[in-house]
């Protein structure tokens, strides 16, 4: 009886460990992908950078993209 309980606990531990590793290995978002609803999912060398959209001075939305860290983007006319 003790052997059955011990075996069950070991199997439960193994399954829990596998599930935890699978959650940590979620695919990351590559450069220029939208991250508005998932700001922490950009790949490690990228950052989720957000920009507000305005029309007639009023904000109408927000866009977020995975961009390189430390890079400054400027608007071209």
Curated annotation (Swiss-Prot):
Pfam families assigned to the protein according to its UniProt record, in alphabetical order: Toxin_35
Q: Where is the signal peptide?
A: 1-20
| Pro-piece positions | 21-26
Name the organs or tissues of expression.
Expressed by the venom gland.
Predominant cellular place of this UniProt entry's protein? secreted
Keyword Signal present in the record's keywords: the answer is yes
Provide the species name: Lycosa singoriensis (Wolf spider)
Please give the superkingdom of this protein's source: Eukaryota
Sorted alphabetically, which keywords does the UniProt record give?
Disulfide bond, Secreted, Signal, Toxin
User: What family is reported?
Assistant: Belongs to the neurotoxin 19 (CSTX) family. 08 (U8-Lctx) subfamily.
Instruction: Extract one GO cellular component term from the record.
Output: extracellular region
Q: Which GO terms describe its molecular function?
A: toxin activity
- What is known about its processing and modification? Contains 4 disulfide bonds.
Q: Where in the cell is it found?
A: Secreted
Keyword Secreted among record annotations: yes
Q: InterPro entries, from UniProt? A: Spider_toxin_CSTX_knottin
- Its name, as the record gives it, is U8-lycotoxin-Ls1m
């Amino acid at each position: 009886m003790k052997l059955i309980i011990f075996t069950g606990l070991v199997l439960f531990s193994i399954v829990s460990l596998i599930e935890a590793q699978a959650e940590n290995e979620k695919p990351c978002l590559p450069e220029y992908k939208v991250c508005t609803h998932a700001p922490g999912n950009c790949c490690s060398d990228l950052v989720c950078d957000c920009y507000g959209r305005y029309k007639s001075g009023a904000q109408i939305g927000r866009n977020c993209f995975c961009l390189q860290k430390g890079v400054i983007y400027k608007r071209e006319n």
